[in-house]
Amino acid sequence: MIIITGPTAVGKTDLSIAICCKLNAEIVSIDSRQLYRYMDIGTGKPTLSQRKIVRHHLIDIVDPDEYYSVYQFRLDAIRAIQDIVKRGKIPLFAGGTGLYIDSLVRGIFEGVSRDEELRKQLLQKETQCPGVLRSMLERIDPELADRIHKNDLKRTVRALEIWIKSKEKPSELRKKVKPVGRFTVIILHRDREELYDRINLRVNEMFQAGLLDEVKDLMKRGYSKNLNALRTIGYQESIAHLEGKLNFESTVELVKKNTRHFARRQVIWFRRYKDAIVIDLSSSSYRDAVNTISRIVLQDFQHDSFYDGGFSYD
């Protein structure tokens, strides 16, 4: 299967739709923000007209106040693959959320359910004795502790939760996970200045399209500004503006700045995929890129066994 990824504003959406039109394929979104309802403009969702041209999966599937894990994404992605293949079409993954991509190509462990009472107890211990949870993690699973930043309390609590409930080291459990299947990752690239210009243009277009009104609507619906869904670039800055903390010009510039920083982090993350195919959109034409990726998708379709029912959906 094929994953098309790249930093925000690089051109994933338009390119993926063009490829799907050529190949009678459908898109499975790999975006941790586009899955939320009522958050269209700020997340850069494909328009309704684009979604009529090509069917998209895993967009608008949960409300902003619903919990949605990487593991749930993996399960939903598998169901989407089954549905698309059953109807004789090709699934094309597109999006820029690195953890979601990892859950597909490397697998993810989510063997124990969330235990809110246990988490509350752990956080109380941390409040009473700052650093105690980090010390616990270093003692029970030093391998995992080396991979979790000392100030990352959220992941530390999750690791301890897994250990307490499973009686096994999280690092050992993670070694047992398997990828969903065989994936070819295609990374779209643009020269930095060109990418930043596209980001600045996109942010301007978002505000012109009514981002502030979209944020007002979310507030009217009763959604807290502290929700994970609303801790999204574009929304947090807009909320600050609506609260009188930023003027409009400063808000727009801050969204541009934060989006550029986010794109830089995405580029660094994608370097992890050593076997990925890089398509440079700054040096090749849009048409050539569509044709090149379409050929890759077709070759994958012809040689991957899962299209013939040989795919494992564990």
From Swiss-Prot:
It comes from the Bacteria. Coiled coil: none annotated. Substrate binds at residues 8-13. Its cofactor is Mg(2+). ATP binds at residues 6-13. Its EC number is 2.5.1.75. It catalyses: adenosine(37) in tRNA + dimethylallyl diphosphate = N(6)-dimethylallyladenosine(37) in tRNA + diphosphate. The keyword Acyltransferase does not apply. Pfam families: IPPT (PF01715). The record marks 97 as: Interaction with substrate tRNA. Keywords: ATP-binding, Magnesium, Nucleotide-binding, Transferase, tRNA processing. GO terms for biological process: tRNA modification. InterPro entries: Dimethylallyltransferase (IPR039657), IPT (IPR018022), P-loop_NTPase (IPR027417). GO terms for molecular function: ATP binding; tRNA dimethylallyltransferase activity. Residues 31-34 are annotated as: Interaction with substrate tRNA. Belongs to the IPP transferase family. Catalyzes the transfer of a dimethylallyl group onto the adenine at position 37 in tRNAs that read codons beginning with uridine, leading to the formation of N6-(dimethylallyl)adenosine (i(6)A). HAMAP family: IPP_trans. Monomer. This is tRNA dimethylallyltransferase. It comes from Pseudothermotoga lettingae (strain ATCC BAA-301 / DSM 14385 / NBRC 107922 / TMO) (Thermotoga lettingae). The gene is miaA.
